[in-house]
Amino acid sequence: TEDPVPYAQALADNPYAGTWASGAAANTGRSEVASAGTSTANMISGGEPPITGKAEQWNGSSWTEVSDLNQSRYAVMGAGTTTAAISFGGADPGNSRIGNTETWDGSSWTEVSDLNEGRFRLGSAQSATYTAALAFGGADPGGAVASTETWNGSTWTEVGDLNAPNYQIPGGAGTNTAALKIGGANDAGSEIALVESWNGSSWTEIADLNTARDNLGGAGTQTSAL
């Protein structure tokens, strides 16, 4: 029988109904990297093992190595594009939680003002920019944190905390004024399903994920996420 709705039209009506496809491997295999950009123009930096500052760019078909971060680190977060990106937080080779922030101009990284609270395995608004970014949650030496900071292109400012401290939350979506915090782990290390919505000044708990999980991916906007 004929499908009631052609696949192409269904995909146009609901782009999240698509499928995953394999792409070319990065030049250096690693985990816990910072990511910035889109599915056809992306950039990754940092990661482990071993803990590195290596950065690579994706053009939709292949990866190319570019200039390294000044500070090697893993469990780091990022935002922006392949020509204007920001990388922040993480843990250094000595496993110290750091607040180091670096910006990318298309050819090299420059160290700028640090986060107020050094942390790793934090969250980021994936559609934010290198002049308007958001950092939330993560873990410092004392455990999971709830603190949130916004970046204005030159400095980080502490703003409203998450309702619950959690870390291992790379799953984030939206911008620095309209974002989602998705899943993660609580201070005991248990996976959680908690989702919070950010309006530019405060976080509000909303509907949970169907399956609790941490170290997940996130994409989209505050009102249409994956």
Model-derived segments and spans:
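Polar, enzyme-active/binding microenvironments
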Residues: 1-226
